[in-house]
Amino acid sequence: MLSSTTIATKKPVLLGGEALANAVASISFPFSEVVQSQRSFIAAAWALRRHGIICLRGAASNQDLTSIRDEIDNLLGNIESNDLSNLQDIAYLNLPNHRVLKGYNNFRDADRPVINYRVKRPDGRTGSDAGMIDIFHPERLSSNLGKRIQDCLHEKLIQRLLLVSSLNQMKVKCRNLYLNRGVLDTRSYHCDGRSLKFKSFVYISDVNELNDGPYCYVKGSHRRRGIWWRSALFNKKNQLGPFEFSQLQGTEAISLFAKAGDMVLSSQKGAHCGHPQHPKAKRTVLVNMYQR
């Protein structure tokens, strides 16, 4: 399959200024109110059903965020200094010059954490996310991380919210920690398949501008079948991957700027992507995937 960026695809208009502020405000809810108020809880669930994405402000505590950041910084420091003796006993290390596992399913089903460094594709295709470190099952790296991550994810509450929103019981399938370090080669707008699937993203670091590499989303695209079929026909004709949203002309996308501790929750059937970063930018996000 070819990359959607190698031929003429149609991208959405990325909102900015007051238009972006208004669009994001309509899907934003204080986490404390969603917890305490049934009215706010229902409003958040309904917004997720309608728009495919919401932002819960202030979902994680500063203490949990600081502890996660400190432990991950120490872990990366050990890898960069080639001090791997302890890590190799508790995790699979997929380093740029030494790969021990291949394939998403093997990462997801691994019996221990997988620290996967994404690298440029050998065939030159775009969308590699080179420069990203994707840690599968980070909660298993230590008991402290396990507790802190569980505290940040609020899985029981999110499962109840997803039940009200989608009328389906969703289960946790995989937890990840995304560490983006100057990622320039991001995948264009796409969906994660056509089955019902949600992800929560807890921002461990602030994402204040496009250079930070925010999560971008076309509101309502999870329900707009016309957009999907238009892209599907184009993809088949041009040998693109089946899940690329290649024909998004006439649509608008939002970039989710957020503070550390905010949680974004989105339907992965919708058109989404990560914005390319500045070469020196850093972004850390805790991710949870929910499926039936």
Annotated model-derived regions:
Residues 228-229, 276-278:
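Short conserved micro-motifs at the rims of enzyme active sites and ligand-binding pockets
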